[in-house]
């Protein structure tokens, strides 16, 4: 309770100062202010100059930012202004700025925004500074900065009030700047390879393109139930049918499922589709995206992540799912076997057989998830997923039990999912119907039948390679972050 009273006392004092500014004819919530430099530009241009060189140059600058430190007494004061790029020191003398400007400085609290015009100089201690000539009040902060702005330690507050985290935690601020750069570079990479960025609906009559539980809503005007998209896949492939040939979309998708260190119900994906390509071409594309981000954003191929060194340079390992299971668990699924034989194997290995499992393929996937996933530390393409768990992927020509699909695993987690797209409308309808049956048997992640998409395929879709990358996990990898909430500006909270 004492903390609340103290906070209220501070807020009252700040409001009094706001009124004092108004009484003095100063607007506490200013207007447009034009800067000549940000803090980084000043440091890059003048950090190497000596005090004497700067004095001789007699340069002036105009800066603006949030007041983060303030000290001094009498007729001289020092402060630091913080902008997006960093901080710059202010040197304020009453005899230089005049009575009115010095009053502005005295009345300013930490957290307030000031604009400052003055001489670019260095102090006797060698710190680059602006020797103020004129101060402009830009915005009064009516609440104090948290915990003396040394960084929020309460993680829930950091997530709920991200703006405070960004003010007080430079590491967090830089992480989100890196996120923006990563997304920009992915766009640059895709655009440079002739892909068109497109936008597809977030609200759909049927949620498809992935195995996940959707969020539902109701469209009042049309009086129909709709689902938020769980993937962008089916609309993007309609564009391939329409002749766009190479498309991608960066956007939010929504899955009404559990939350943990690597899952948030609202997250960002990049999906791409390329006509006349197959899943092996898309492996090369995926490698290229990761390596382009490594080169342009972080400047290195070897990443420190979760106590491990992850090398994203060179060719990623490629292994068939069945071979991976055989290597790790010693169980061989290459020979043909009945569902009953596979079920017996599952029970021997303490693998639960769900009611909606109807084929050996489901059992193979369970073995992979139990035994193999967590062992895949370095970037690894696992391909050859069973047909039953890959309703949108093309069957492998040599062994139709499996599909031309891959997932990219790093540090035991999936980072990308891709395949040679199924373009046979009759086969696609049969797989949709099998999914619908699984849904009836209790598989709440199974999809229904999207007849409109099947109709689109009936008009002809060329052989196509498709890719989906989880952007949030990718950002986690490249920023060394183990919680997805630390790479989402506003994560979902209860």
Swiss-Prot record:
Chain coiled-coil ranges: none
Keyword Ligase in annotation: yes
Disulphide linkage map: none
The protein's required cofactors: Mg(2+)
The enzyme's E.C. designation: 6.1.1.6
One GO CC term on file: cytosol
Alphabetical UniProt keywords: Aminoacyl-tRNA synthetase, ATP-binding, Cytoplasm, Ligase, Magnesium, Metal-binding, Nucleotide-binding, Protein biosynthesis
GO biological process: lysyl-tRNA aminoacylation
Entry's localization field: Cytoplasm
Note describing how the cofactor binds: Binds 3 Mg(2+) ions per subunit.
Catalytic activity of the protein: tRNA(Lys) + L-lysine + ATP = L-lysyl-tRNA(Lys) + AMP + diphosphate
Gene Ontology terms for molecular function: ATP binding; catalytic activity, acting on a protein; lysine-tRNA ligase activity; magnesium ion binding; transferase activity; tRNA binding
Residues reported to bind Mg(2+) 1: 407, 414
Pfam families documented for this protein: tRNA-synt_2, tRNA_anti-codon
InterPro entries with a match to the protein in the record: Aa-tRNA-synt_II, aa-tRNA-synth_II, aa-tRNA-synth_II/BPL/LPL, Lys-tRNA-ligase_II, Lys-tRNA-ligase_II_N, Lys-tRNA-synth_II_C, NA-bd_OB-fold, NA-bd_OB_tRNA
SUBUNIT field: Homodimer.
UniProt protein name: Lysine--tRNA ligase
Name of the coding gene: lysS
